[in-house]
């Protein structure tokens, strides 16, 4: 019975996180996953697909200074 409780807790925590937070490689670079059609205008950085889902790319907004 304890195994079922542990399994339920693990599944609950696994589905609790937001989908946008699942793409660690992109977020480590300071970016977010955007539709591929979006153009990253300088001073933004376009990191390409990285670990973003299908038809999306990693883009970091520039500082705008």
UniProtKB/Swiss-Prot annotation:
Keywords: Antimicrobial, Disulfide bond, Ion channel impairing toxin, Myotoxin, Neurotoxin, Potassium channel impairing toxin, Secreted, Signal, Toxin, Voltage-gated potassium channel impairing toxin. Residues 1-22 form the signal peptide. Expressed by the venom gland. Monomer. It is found in: Secreted. This is Myotoxin-1. It comes from the Eukaryota. One of its GO terms (cellular component) is extracellular region. One of its GO terms (biological process) is envenomation resulting in occlusion of the pore of voltage-gated potassium channel in another organism. GO terms for molecular function: potassium channel regulator activity; toxin activity. Cationic peptide that possesses multiple functions. It acts as a cell-penetrating peptide (CPP), and as a potent voltage-gated potassium channel (Kv) inhibitor. It exhibits antimicrobial activities, hind limb paralysis, and severe muscle necrosis by a non-enzymatic mechanism. Disulfide bonds join 26-58, 33-52, 40-59.
């Amino acid at each position: 019975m304890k195994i079922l409780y542990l399994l339920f807790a693990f599944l609950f925590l696994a589905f609790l996180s937001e989908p946008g937070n699942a793409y660690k490689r992109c977020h480590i670079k300071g970016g977010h996953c955007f539709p591929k059609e979006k153009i990253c205008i300088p001073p933004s950085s376009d990191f390409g697909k990285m670990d973003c889902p299908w038809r999306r790319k990693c883009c970091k907004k520039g500082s705008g200074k």
